[in-house]
Each structure stands twice: as C-alpha cells, then as structure tokens.
UniProtKB/Swiss-Prot annotation:
GO terms for cellular component: extracellular space. Keywords: Antibiotic, Antimicrobial, Cleavage on pair of basic residues, Defensin, Disulfide bond, Secreted, Signal. One of its GO terms (biological process) is innate immune response in mucosa. Residues 20-61, 96-97 form a propeptide. The keyword Secreted applies. Pfam families: Defensin_1 (PF00323), Defensin_propep (PF00879). InterPro entries: Alpha-defensin (IPR016327), Alpha-defensin_C (IPR006081), Alpha-defensin_N (IPR002366). This is Defensin-A2. Belongs to the alpha-defensin family. Disulfide bonds join 66-93, 68-82, 72-92. Has antimicrobial activity.
Length: 97
C-alpha cells in the first residue's frame, strides 16, 4: 500500500511539472574566455610531471606554450578555443622540455 501511494505521489509531481509553462524569459548563462591574439605573447604554463611511482623527487619540469591560431601547427595540440575581436580561434599548445 505504501508503494502504491508513493508511486501515485511521484506520478502527480511529474504531471504537475509537465503542466507548468516553460519560462521563455530565462536568462542565458554566458561564459567568457580570455582574449588572446597570435601577436601577443604566448601563454606559458609550467608543469611538474611526476614519475611512474608518483614520487615528487623524480619530478621533471616541462613547459607548455600555448598560442591562439586559426590552425594548429605540426607538433601542437588543439587545447580548446580562444576569442579575439568576435572571432573564435584554436588554442594550440606545445610541450617543451
């Protein structure tokens, strides 16, 4: 009997949710990305890579350099997008030792 009343309550809530009008005036969430152009200095990120054992004493330092370009060059990886002057570009990153 409890199960039946629980199912009826869930069915009632689902029907109420579907019957409510959708608010078309809801605000949009806009996320802004940092603006980077190809002529500006590249973004450089220092990373510490850990060895297989995860031991911090075996850490080696490497640098990842990122540019905003229309296309990634050889050995660069597409790491997302960036915007400049209402244009969207590819964020191209390259790992150097």
């Amino acid at each position: 009997m409890r199960t039946l009343s629980l199912l009826l309550a869930l069915l009632f809530l689902a029907a109420q949710t579907l019957a409510q009008p959708i608010d078309e005036g809801a605000e949009e969430v806009i996320t802004e990305e940092p603006e980077i152009t190809e002529t500006q200095d590249p973004t450089t990120i220092m990373l510490i890579e850990r060895g297989i054992g995860g031991d911090s004493t075996d850490a080696t330092r490497s640098t990842i350099t990122c540019y905003c370009r229309s296309r990634c060059r050889m050995l660069e990886k597409n790491s997302g997008t960036c915007r400049s002057s209402n244009c969207t570009y590819t964020l191209c990153c390259k790992k150097t030792s």
